Swiss-Prot record:
Name listed for the protein in its UniProt record: Elongation factor 1-gamma
Reported function: Probably plays a role in anchoring the complex to other cellular components.
Source organism superkingdom: Eukaryota
The keyword Protein biosynthesis appears for this protein: yes
Ranges of residues in domain GST N-terminal: 1-82
Protein keywords: Elongation factor, Protein biosynthesis
Keyword NADP: no
Domain EF-1-gamma C-terminal: 262-422
Length: 422
């Protein structure tokens, strides 16, 4: 006897169970002629779930609602199922990522989606908060996937199915390419999974949305007309005369002009003689005599009043035991620093010929402190110790030269790799 799943054919929460069924071989059928907002309000349906939740699974032992619970149930119907892990720690990690996908990814996508599609009132601060929280979650997921093909272990698990279905909703409704390109490992993961045969059988050919839906225009309620009887009952009041308003001012009352975005505090600093883009071009274009041309040019351009230099060192170098994981860690950090590209230049060195590898770097920032918005938005910053360069110390100044130049050996050790943020 097949289990009956009550949901629409395009319900991403139903997809979770249908994909699990493909992996387990459990027979699950969609209820015929299900219509959201109609079927789930019938007396028969409300007997299965008093609040009309969708999806709902009918089983020989009674109904189950909540999509993650349904997917877990179907996964556990098959003994020794790799979808739920082979050890207690695997099981815990699978549950961890299921919760993460629901609370950090799905919840924020839904908060972004509902007002854009007219299901809730559009409030710009609420949308900004949802997008910011979603980016933070995708950043964390991107870091994990930099060194992992799947969320747990080396095979598809229930966590991958649920998180991918959550991402599916975002990729197909809201998250355009320019948004997801900030998270390349998430992109690679998503497209790898949705093109797996068992996923594809349920999801079909997945296409990423090309635009974010515009905000629905709010209709102003029409003013009720006063009845003639009311007009007769109430004596006319003398209207107060107000000076005629300029047309421009009157128009503002009807539709307020969009407020300009607040400027970044770094744009409000006193002008600097150093043009950061000029330095970046000099760095990129210097192929020979690097110290004589690029390094000398840097110090000629450098404005100690308008910019500051900072050394950084990874706090947990003892953990850097795998070369490609260490390189991906640094690469992910540089990707997440993209928000500071207008105000920063950086060099990161991965040092050592054998593990554990050391990660050290040098950063040039606009202003005299590390920009607060960078500290707040890029969580990698907390993983490094930061020391402001003292230019009165010739040894520190020479160390700046060596980092910019990728000098090898560096502090007596070979360089595994050098990465530049510009």
């Amino acid at each position: 006897m097949a289990l009956v799943l009550h949901a629409g054919k395009t319900n991403k929460n139903a997809f979770k169970t249908l994909i699990v069924a493909e992996y387990t071989g459990v027979k699950v059928e969609l209820a015929p002629d299900f219509e959201m907002g109609v079927t789930n309000k019938t007396p028969e349906y409300l007997k299965l779930n008093p609040i009309g939740k969708v999806p709902l699974l009918e089983t020989p032992d009674g109904p189950i609602f909540e999509s993650n619970a349904i997917a877990r149930y179907v996964a556990r119907l098959k003994a020794d199922n790799p979808l739920i892990g082979s050890s207690l720690i695997d099981y815990a990690h699978i549950e961890q990522w299921i919760d993460f996908g629901s609370l950090e990814i799905d919840a924020n996508i839904i908060s972004w989606f509902r007002p854009r599609f007219g299901y809730a009132v559009y409030l710009p601060p609420a949308e900004e908060a949802a997008i910011s929280a979603l980016k933070r979650a995708l950043g964390a997921l991107n870091t994990h996937l930099a060194s992992n093909t799947y969320l747990v272990g080396h095979f598809v698990t229930l966590a991958d199915i649920i998180v991918t279905c959550n991402l599916f909703f975002g990729f197909t409704k809201l998250m355009i390419k320019s948004f997801t390109s900030e998270f390349p490992h998430v992109e690679r993961y998503f497209w790898t999974l949705v093109n797996q045969p068992k996923f594809k059988k349920v999801l079909g050919d997945v296409k990423q949305t090309e635009s974010v839906p515009p905000v629905p225009s709010a209709k102003k309620p029409s003013q009720p007309k006063e009845t003639k009887s009311k007009a007769k009952e109430e004596p006319k009041k003398e209207a107060k005369k107000e000076p005629a308003k300029p047309k421009a001012e009157a128009a503002e009352e009807v539709e307020e002009a969009p407020k300009p975005k607040p400027k970044n505090p770094l744009d409000l600093l006193p002008p600097s003689n150093m043009v950061l883009d000029d330095w970046k071009r000099l760095y990129s274009n210097t192929k020979t005599n690097f110290r004589e041309v690029a390094i000398k040019g840097f110090w000629d351009m450098y404005d100690p009043e308008g910019y500051s230099l900072w050394f950084c060192e990874y706090k947990y170098n003892d953990e850097n035991t795998v070369s490609f994981v260490t390189l991906n860690k640094v690469g992910g950090f540089l990707q997440r620093m993209d928000l500071a590209r207008k105000y920063a230049f950086g060099k990161m060195l991965v040092i050592g010929s054998e593990p554990p590898f050391k990660v050290k770097g040098l950063w040039l920032f606009r202003g005299q402190e590390i920009p607060p918005f960078v500290m707040e938005e890029c969580y990698d910053m907390e993983l490094y110790n930061w020391t402001k360069v003292d230019l009165s110390d010739e040894n520190q100044k020479e160390r700046v030269n060596q980092v910019i130049e990728d000098q090898e050996p560096f502090e007596g050790e070979a360089l595994l790799d050098a990465k530049c943020f510009k």
